Amino acid sequence: MKVRTSVKKICSSCKVIRRKGVIRVICTNPKHKQRQA
């Protein structure tokens, strides 16, 4: 899980979702998981 100020899609299977007011990126590749700080 990467925590960064700007979350972006890295590949085509990345999805930007909002969970409890936190913007996250979920993907089939675990390395692409991100969360907004």
Swiss-Prot record:
MF terms from GO for this chain are: structural constituent of ribosome
Q: Is Ribosomal protein among the key words of this record?
A: yes
Its Gene Ontology cellular component terms are: cytoplasm; ribonucleoprotein complex; ribosome
Its keywords, alphabetically, are: Ribonucleoprotein, Ribosomal protein
**What InterPro entries does the database record attribute to this sequence?**
Ribosomal_bL36, Ribosomal_bL36_sp
Is Ribosomal protein one of the keywords? yes
What does the entry give for GO biological process? translation
Q: Give the Pfam families listed for this entry.
A: Ribosomal_L36
Q: Which family does it belong to?
A: Belongs to the bacterial ribosomal protein bL36 family.
Enumerate the HAMAP family for this protein.
Ribosomal_bL36 (MF_00251)
The protein, known as: Large ribosomal subunit protein bL36
Q: Which organism is it from?
A: Leptospira borgpetersenii serovar Hardjo-bovis (strain JB197)
Q: What is the lineage of its organism?
A: Bacteria, Pseudomonadati, Spirochaetota, Spirochaetia, Leptospirales
Q: Which gene encodes it?
A: rpmJ
